[in-house]
Amino acid sequence: MNPKHWGRAVWTIIFIVLSQAGLDGNIEACKRKLYTIVSTLPCPACRRHATIAIEDNNVMSSDDLNYIYYFFIRLFNNLAFDPKYAIDVSKVKPL
């Protein structure tokens, strides 16, 4: 399934989950939700790419919400088809 049809919605959900963890402080629940989202992406290649990136960067073992947050920002920027959608990390406030 083509990510252009569902990609923005999924990224919105990912960043909502991260923002909620910034408010409630439940990093473990946040990581479980994020892994569930990523491991059920409708595109097999996207699913594989994202889970490998999560594993390679030890996201699931991190207790630092901002590490996880900035990881997903970098992943988003690496996958953005159009540079105009890239997130300027210098303008992002830590959670």
Swiss-Prot record:
Residues covered by the ERV/ALR sulfhydryl oxidase domain: 1-95
Assembly information from the UniProt record: Interacts with OPG128; this interaction involves formation of a transient disulfide-bonded intermediate, allowing disulfide bond transfer.
Disulphide bonds in the chain: 43-46
Residues spanning the membrane: 9-25
Virion surface side: 26-95
Organism per entry: Monkeypox virus
Co-factor requirement: FAD
InterPro entries: ERV/ALR_sulphydryl_oxid_sf, ERV/ALR_sulphydryl_oxidase, Sulphydryl_Oase_FAD-link_ERV1
Name of this chain's protein: Probable FAD-linked sulfhydryl oxidase OPG072
Localisation per UniProt entry: Virion membrane; Host cytoplasm
Keywords per UniProt: Disulfide bond, FAD, Flavoprotein, Host cytoplasm, Late protein, Membrane, Oxidoreductase, Redox-active center, Transmembrane, Transmembrane helix, Viral envelope protein, Virion
A molecular function (GO) term: thiol oxidase activity
Function noted in UniProt: FAD-dependent sulfhydryl oxidase that catalyzes disulfide bond formation. The complete pathway for formation of disulfide bonds in intracellular virion membrane proteins sequentially involves thiol-disulfide transfer between OPG072, OPG128 and OPG088.
Catalytic activity: 2 R'C(R)SH + O2 = R'C(R)S-S(R)CR' + H2O2
Induction behaviour: Expressed in the early phase of the viral replicative cycle.
SUPFAM superfamilies, per database record: FAD-dependent thiol oxidase (SSF69000)
Enzyme Commission numbers on file: 1.8.3.2
Lineage of the species this protein comes from: Viruses, Varidnaviria, Bamfordvirae, Nucleocytoviricota, Pokkesviricetes
Major localization class: virion
Gene assigned in the entry: OPG072
